[in-house]
Amino acid sequence: ADSVQLIQMLFDGLMTCLADAEGHFERNDIKGKHESIGKATKILVGLQSALDFEEGKELAANLSDLYDYCVRRLLKANIRNDIDGIKEVRSLIQEVKGAWEMLPQILNKDVKVSMVS
């Protein structure tokens, strides 16, 4: 798997953890919710540590801020038993995940264009 695929796999895992956390919340499974949020937080930290600030500059900084916000929001949601926090993070991450899913198509187009020039 290349680096884009690895990042996509992290996003898939993150979305699964967030969905699991919501399910645990709805079933009043406090231990399960706590574990799922813990896993989601670790994945967010992993995504944040994979950012390339030299290459990505402003985009990397913005993603870092977003991941940091999501970690704080999940911790608050866990402490306050707030499903809306989990849903908010899930919605934010879904948008970023969607952009990563389009990246291979964009990269392939760039490669084809540069090969033609």
Language-model features: locations:
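C-terminal-biased regions
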Residues: 1-12, 17-117
